[in-house]
From Swiss-Prot:
Protein name: Histidine ammonia-lyase
Linked residues for 5-imidazolinone (Ala-Gly): A143-G145
One Pfam entry name: Lyase_aromatic
InterPro entries to which the protein is assigned, alphabetical: Aromatic_Lyase (IPR001106), Fumarase/histidase_N (IPR024083), HutH (IPR005921), L-Aspartase-like (IPR008948), Phe/His_NH3-lyase_AS (IPR022313)
The organism's place on the tree of life at top rank: Bacteria
Catalyses which reaction(s): L-histidine = trans-urocanate + NH4(+)
Compartments, as annotated in UniProt: Cytoplasm
Lineage: Bacteria, Pseudomonadati, Pseudomonadota, Gammaproteobacteria, Pseudomonadales
Gene that encodes it: hutH
Lyase keyword on record: yes
Amino acid sequence: MTELTLKPGTLTLAQLRAIHAAPVRLQLDASAAPAIDASVACVEQIIAEDRTAYGINTGFGLLASTRIASHDLENLQRSLVLSHAAGIGAPLDDDLVRLIMVLKINSLSRGFSGIRRKVIDALIALVNAEVYPHIPLKGSVGASGDLAPLAHMSLVLLGEGKARYKGQWLPATEALAIAGLEPLTLAAKEGLALLNGTQASTAYALRGLFQAEDLYAAAIACGGLSVEAALGSRSPFDARVHEVRGQRGQIDTAACFRDLLGDSSEVSLSHKNCDKVQDPYSLRCQPQVMGACLTQLRQAAEVLGIEANAVSDNPLVFAAEGDVISGGNFHAEPVAMAADNLALAIAEIGSLSERRISLMMDKHMSQLPPFLVENGGVNSGFMIAQVTAAALASENKALSHPHSVDSLPTSANQEDHVSMAPAAGKRLWEMAENTRGVLAIEWLGACQGLDLRKGLKTSAKLEQARQALRSEVPHYDRDRFFAPDIEKAVDLLAKGSLTGLLPAGVLPSL
């Protein structure tokens, strides 16, 4: 199990990827305590002085002008959590819940939320015990924060709701006991601090980012294999071509292709003196298209890395000045826009891959047997696999429609503009699944094409990619049940089997 000492506000993308991938044992850095305690003291002073402060001794949303009596403050926080736990849909998996919880711990621990260490420690104990609250997938519009998902997360702290432990659902009180905890009574401001924030939206988008990174790496490897299978040229990857344009993503992508393709191979030498002048765009323009995708990944990663370390609570407690300020950091518009940009990249990765599949199957373009199979007519080969790839790529065109431009007023028009960041993030997973399927078919097709080059080898790194597939899926010598081959290739890609072929430092979290 990964051990992490959390210094609030310093989580890296690599750490976030690791937290999403596997259980973690978390410890809060001792340096966090003074700021946390100071924010709590500030809230307590406001109550003692009987000052009005939103979320501490008032109602919420449109009810913000309703003053709450001191004897009702604890009940106010409990009622908030119970009433806001109104999500719907399938429960989030453990990996995503863990990431949401760590993001919330990270935010609360920065000391601007007025929440006691006791509550933060309880969340840490749940993470360390691998006790994951039941959080439904749907119910947040990404402003005012992710209220419903985070309310479901917080229910367990109160002894309400349920949690999953080692794959089994348990009542909250039993789940708390496993973590060595008892139900908490929330103090003033604490329920709101737990519920308000962009942590679910950010986790949704981070998962999409991590998946998109793996897809980018797989597409570079599969695209390189396709260049070789279709007897493409290495010239379009020449560094000089890309330096004069100056687009960093394009420059770095071309370098990745040069690293994978090498200077030459048996395949490239076999057509050294051919009369082809230029390759089709799906081969030749890979650095330009995939470079643009890499730029989107990097820009989204920057936004999400900042948001993962942000304080997105409301109101914020500035203990040094004794101020409590209502703002709008809960509005997840930056996350929604980042997710929209990731959607464009995921869609384009799949779209370009599908075109390379089609190219390889066309004997006039690739000089390979029609549909990548010998004895065509009797055998249909990759004919319908390409149709599947086309269907998946087309689905992603619709799914890539931006969500950040959508809004629907809530809370009686008090919350009159929202981000739709959760929807923007979660559709990335379906898009990634679609593009993974397209890339799996290209991987199969490119390796098939190379097999049909009668024993010629490609570069050392691309041979690794080829053998990674051939260790699971044999050559397609005659028609057979095709779907299992695609499923095996998809499974390999989902495990990141081709991600390690890229040079270090290209992708934001790797």
